[in-house]
Amino acid sequence: MEDHKPQTLVELLKQAVAAGADREALRFKQDKAWVGMTAERLLERVRNVALGLYRLGIRKSDRIAILAESGPLWSITDYAVLSNGAVSVPIYPTQPTHQVEYILRESEPRLLFVSTARQMRRVNDALKKFPDLRIVPFQPIADGENLISFDSIEEEGARLAAEQPELYDAISSDVHAGDLASIIYTSGTSGEPKGVMLTHSNVTFNALASGTFLRIEPGGVMLSFLPLSHIFERMVLYLCLHRGVQINYATGIETVAADIQEVRPTLMSTVPRLLEKIYARMQKNAADGGGMKKRIFDWSLRVARRSAQLSTRNESLPPLLQLQREIADQLVFAKLRQAVGGKIRRMVSGGAALPSELALVFTGAGIPVLQGYGLTETSPVIAVNTLEHNRVGSVGRPLPGLDIKIAEDGEILTRGPHVFQGYFNKPEDTAAAFTDEPAESQRWFKTGDIGLFDPDGFLFITDRKKDLIKTSGGKYVAPQMIEGMINQSEFVEQAVIVGDKRKYVSALIVPDFERLRAWAKEQGVGTTDKRELIADRRVVDMIKADVNRLTRELADYEKVKRIGLLAEEFSIDGGELTPTLKVKRRVVEEKYGELIESLYSGGE
């Protein structure tokens, strides 16, 4: 597999097939049953769709948009586009219509692939603005203008392959490392999306370096549930396919829990929010059991934390702790592992800060959670923990082959083969994203994150540079760290820290209303209405006490003095979240400005 180091994403695919044509490369649900696809059949379908696109006139550097939920057709389309030397422009299936319109207007795609008629209806207002745009639905749609069926493209490509057997190899061999592979629009927590231009060499380098660094071996099983519109999941799929790991596509985020039990993955890429939900469910089950069950659960968590603190420093467990861990394993940890399929060897977490508590508990329970770090602009991974070197609280050590340094103001800077080519049609934004150096090759990309290295070379992220809160007393507060702590509460669904230029820090909190209603019933609170619950002083005091407990180790200036409870969850549709579920702080602060002001009236 490694005789020739692939330079493009197409070569990654071809090497994967050459290494095991008959192996089951992909699995997906069809009519409620798992269906497999061999590596050879995958390449055949990619070839047919690629040649079908070629027949339609798609050529090198043409841009092709994909607006679809993750699944095998997403990957086949992506590889087919790349095989032609064309450029994939993914659009999140949850992207607001006005942003879909913006992306289509700026990127000017030759074709738009869409998953379903429902998805087309959702963005119909945007599509009306582009009457000449040809649309390819994955599923047959009876009527509509400028529609080309996916099946017809694939069938036409198969005919062309039969007529000209060498054509696919000729076309795909003309794709080079420096060619543009994808324009990925970062959702951004403010302003319009920016199109990040990534080359084949950018993403190929990242996939190869990540696979080697993490020691991903053939024969593994992956469950894919994060959106392929995001470069993190997409790079992981390129990596897994190349290294002989079977990819299983979850039907949707709502089916992940059931899919895990059926697939029993050895590898997953995940986000902290999923781990937080699993952890909160564990806490709820233990609390509902009461008495001895709750005490055993709490004791087991303490054992997990102590075990992980030692094991991640490569220190042996003392005999007593080893015995305690074996007991806790039988009572609690085995059930937790079963909740994630029972075979997980590593979960790689990215996209947001991972609270140390979660990493310690899962790792101590035998589910190694490896936090990594990166951005769309860096293809995406910059650093990641490994099974052999997993320092909880850090995002790991840098990938081999790239450079990282910390600027004087604490900002993380990076350069190397992973760094993007610039923002599409935005030269000023591109220039602002890099340091000013005499030679372009010497420029450093400015990540916008604040961080530091420990003496052993592990990178720690403290916060987003633009998100740092400076209190009126001149103290800097990292909101994401505090939010991560608060989100561990079984009563908290979402939390946002506020307090810039204020005397103290406060928190806006969306409660977990299912758990809160159960607590309220036990306490004799005579309502289940959301707005009445958050107005009840007993509820406010209880959640504030839980926040105090979870943040007790913070410095005084970092501690939350007041909380404001919200009746509605932050959402993409509501405008408070990006498609990658990052909070748009400015939107939240504007929307709840009156409530925030009330948290600072009348003193502490």
Positions of PLM-derived features:
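Conserved AMP-binding/adenylate-forming core of the ANL superfamily
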Residues: 5, 26-79, 96-101, 149-157, ...
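Conserved pre-ATP/AMP-binding loop-to-beta segment of ANL
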Residues: 21-24, 158-185, 192, 215-221
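Conserved AMP-binding A3 loop
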Residues: 36-40, 174, 181-205
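Structural core segment of the AMP-binding/adenylate-forming
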Residues: 56, 83-156, 542, 548-549
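Conserved ATP-dependent adenylate/AMP-binding module captured primarily in the ANL superfamily
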Residues: 95-126, 206-223, 253-267, 339
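ANL superfamily adenylate-forming
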Residues: 118-177, 282-335
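Conserved ATP-binding/catalytic segment of the ANL
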Residues: 186, 398-471, 488
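Conserved AMP-binding/adenylation subdomain of ANL enzymes
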Residues: 204-221, 228-333, 343
